[in-house]
């Protein structure tokens, strides 16, 4: 049977090319909201972190109705670090809308998600978005998309994919580049005409592939997936199996069944093959599991998610300020929370270490792990993390390391400094082109060469540069790299930082703290331009004497301290440092707090 009343599509694109904004307009124009309903911008980015950063982290489902056809739309993350979300979501759909910015053109993540969609042989609709940008290069971008498709070995049919020209913010679409649209009708029509209806078998035994997981305090874990065949009913007895665990079958019951209407989950009594459904009642259900009829247990093969490339150590906070600011501080709390994250995030890995206090957490990139750290911090957790490390592989006795494909867009005058930095970081230029008045440079660079480069890059390009990277492949180890050219200013006394102590310390470098900040021995309070660390006493008070020289007691002027975000702190960390994370503060500290013990450890290292 062919389901003409249904289409399942995913929207894929590079970060910030306007996916979530376009979905907003599709919801508005299809009558999902009441006329008098107040709806915030980027309504799909419901998580607080997503709204703050303007990025999508979790793939989300919604649906619209157009000419009697229900279109299920899945908004996916555009950042490479959340690629695991994109890979598994593509299993739920039959076609994809590939969004490309009319000025920026295809970017690294565009290539990655497109490759995954082509591998699954999905139908493609190319959407050139933001055509109303003053710097739009519509004709060139069309050529770049075609080149990319050829590069990815697309079939003739995929090369002939329709192109729609949109402005997500204005809510207009047109099939012609030189003709302005009035609304999104051309886009909806293209979806109905080009994305094929599903061929389904409603009478066959039930089979649902779980592609996403949600959690609710009232009903527990909620599985989300597409019904591959058959019909699902609320309170139905089912079996759960997995393609990778042959012979392990669990029995259970679909207690609640929901369908997605607009942004809401609506309870449903039944759903048929092709529908994307949410269900609760199956404890321990996981991504990649297959829910099927008890009399026909058959697992659906699940897409292999790309391996993590970066790891960090999360450990219990053992600084002198431990337990003062956090709600959850013990190793039991930390372990429970990290393993709970695995239930939702397929591209994360957590391993126990030799001690009960520390855990190895691996992810797809620095941003992937920093989002987890920030989320835990907001939930009231207190812990400390090590510097990010890349995951090496040994192939035939030779060490291999992850290589990233880095694309930078910089003003012409900034290229010299970028080339110099890339040379120092073992980057290799593979492509260079002019894009308007700017230069686009493409490098292959070891992943560890990018650690700490973001802030340096923004300084080099006076804040005008844009850099994006994505995992390329594993290659033989490229040799040693220096992590940082600067040293740290380290407090050698515990207490409260005072103006007099900070005034004397600021001659040695740039400070991170204000007067009145509580510090402890071994805490990093600033950055030194020299390569070695310098111990400073920021708690030193000016002692009273009975002699005063005229004019010598002028008010001391302190420079503004450098305030660092979580990502900047992680970039700054050296191998002998840790970042203490609490709901209130971020403090960088030395692994060994005592200055004498630190000096002895350094001497031992030099000898070795």
Question: Model-predicted segments: where are they?
Answer:
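Structural and coupling elements of P-loop NTPases
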Residues: 1-608
């Amino acid at each position: 049977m062919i389901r003409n009343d249904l289409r399942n599509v995913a929207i894929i694109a590079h970060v910030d090319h306007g996916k979530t904004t376009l979905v907003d307009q599709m919801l508005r124009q299809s009558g999902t909201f009441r006329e008098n309903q107040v709806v915030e911008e980027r309504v799909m980015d419901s998580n607080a972190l997503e709204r703050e950063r303007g990025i999508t982290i979790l793939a989300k489902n919604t649906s619209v109705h157009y000419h009697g056809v229900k279109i299920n739309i899945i908004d996916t993350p555009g950042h490479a670090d959340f690629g695991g979300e994109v890979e598994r979501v593509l299993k739920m759909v039959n076609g994809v809308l590939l969004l490309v910015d009319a000025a920026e053109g295809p970017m690294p993540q565009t290539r990655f998600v497109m490759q995954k969609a082509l591998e699954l042989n999905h139908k493609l609709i190319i959407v050139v978005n933001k055509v109303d940008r003053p710097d739009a290069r519509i004709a060139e971008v069309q050529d770049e998309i075609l080149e990319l498709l050829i590069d990815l070995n697309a079939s003739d049919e995929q090369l002939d994919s329709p192109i729609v020209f949109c402005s997500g913010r204005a809510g207009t679409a047109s099939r012609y580049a030189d003709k302005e649209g009035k609304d999104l009708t051309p886009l909806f029509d293209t979806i109905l005409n080009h994305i094929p209806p599903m061929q389904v078998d409603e009478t066959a035994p039930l089979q649902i592939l779980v592609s996403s997981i949600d959690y609710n305090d009232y009903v527990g874990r909620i599985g989300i997936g597409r019904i591959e065949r058959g019909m699902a009913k609320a309170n139905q007895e089912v079996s759960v199996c997995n393609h990778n665990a042959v012979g392990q079958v669990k029995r259970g019951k679909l207690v609640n069944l929901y369908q997605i209407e607009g942004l809401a989950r609506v309870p449903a009594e039944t759903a048929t093959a092709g529908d994307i459904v949410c269900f609760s009642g199956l404890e321990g259900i996981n991504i990649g599991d297959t829910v099927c009829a008890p009399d026909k247990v058959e697992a659906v093969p699940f897409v292999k998610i790309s391996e993590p490339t970066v790891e960090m150590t999360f450990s219990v906070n053992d600084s002198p300020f431990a337990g003062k600011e956090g709600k959850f501080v013990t190793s039991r709390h930390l372990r429970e929370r990290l393993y709970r994250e695995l239930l939702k995030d397929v591209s994360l890995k957590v391993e126990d270490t030799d001690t009960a206090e520390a855990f190895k957490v691996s992810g797809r990139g620095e941003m992937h792990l920093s989002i987890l750290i920030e989320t835990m911090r907001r939930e009231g957790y207190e812990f400390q993390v090590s510097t990010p490390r890349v995951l090496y592989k040994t192939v035939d006795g030779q060490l291999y390391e992850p290589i990233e494909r880095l694309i930078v867009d910089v003003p012409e005058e900034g290229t010299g400094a970028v080339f110099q930095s890339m040379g120092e970081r073992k980057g290799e230029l593979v492509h260079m082109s002019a894009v308007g008045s700017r230069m686009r440079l493409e490098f292959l660079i070891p992943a560890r060469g990018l650690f700490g480069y973001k802030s340096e890059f923004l300084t080099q390009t006076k804040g005008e540069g844009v850099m994006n990277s994505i995992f390329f492949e594993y290659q033989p180890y490229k040799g040693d790299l220096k992590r940082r050219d600067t040293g740290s200013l380290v407090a050698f006394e515990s207490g409260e930082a005072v103006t007099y102590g900070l005034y004397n310390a600021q001659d040695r470098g740039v400070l991170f703290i204000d007067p009145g900040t509580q510090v402890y021995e071994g805490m990093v309070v600033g950055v030194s331009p020299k390569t070695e660390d310098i111990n400073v006493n920021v708690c030193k008070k000016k002692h009273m004497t009975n002699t005063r020289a005229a004019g010598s007691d002028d008010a001391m002027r302190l420079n503004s301290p450098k305030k660092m975000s979580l990502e900047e702190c992680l970039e700054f960390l050296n191998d002998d440092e840790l970042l203490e994370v609490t709901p209130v503060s971020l403090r960088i500290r030395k692994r060994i707090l005592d200055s004498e013990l630190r000096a002895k450890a350094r001497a031992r290292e030099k000898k070795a």
